């Protein structure tokens, strides 16, 4: 994946690339290192209104799939994380 650009990943378009760049995630390796939860937390700290679908999209990008195709168990895990972070 090292030759890939962020925009080559599923779920990551021009706007997502710009948003991720603002929080220090400038390439695929940085996204993989951060993971979906950390990347989402960075976006949340910057934007304060980052939604659950963004978290799903980041995880899907890491897995190389459209976020709609994430396993139900993974979606549930991410939703619990999202709810815990939004309450905190």
Feature locations, PLM:
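Catalytic DNA-binding helix-loop module of base-excision-repair DNA glycosylases/AP lyases
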Residues: 15-23
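Basic nucleic-acid-binding interfaces
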Residues: 3, 26, 45-46
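Phosphate-backbone recognition surface of nucleic-acid-processing proteins
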Residues: 22, 34-48, 52-53
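C-terminal structural segments of small proteins and small subunits
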Residues: 60-88
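Extended, structured, electrostatic nucleic-acid-contact surfaces
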Residues: 1-11, 18, 49-65
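Amphipathic alpha-helical interface surfaces
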Residues: 16, 27-28, 39, 54, ...
């Amino acid at each position: 994946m090292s030759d890939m650009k962020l925009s080559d990943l599923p779920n990551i378009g021009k706007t997502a690339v710009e948003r991720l760049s603002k929080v220090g995630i400038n390439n695929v390796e940085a996204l993989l290192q951060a993971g979906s939860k950390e990347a989402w937390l960075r976006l949340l700290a910057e934007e304060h209104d980052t939604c659950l679908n963004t978290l799903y999209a980041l995880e899907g990008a890491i897995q190389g799939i459209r976020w709609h195709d994430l396993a139900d168990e993974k979606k549930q895990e991410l939703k619990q994380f999202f709810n815990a972070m939004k309450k905190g």
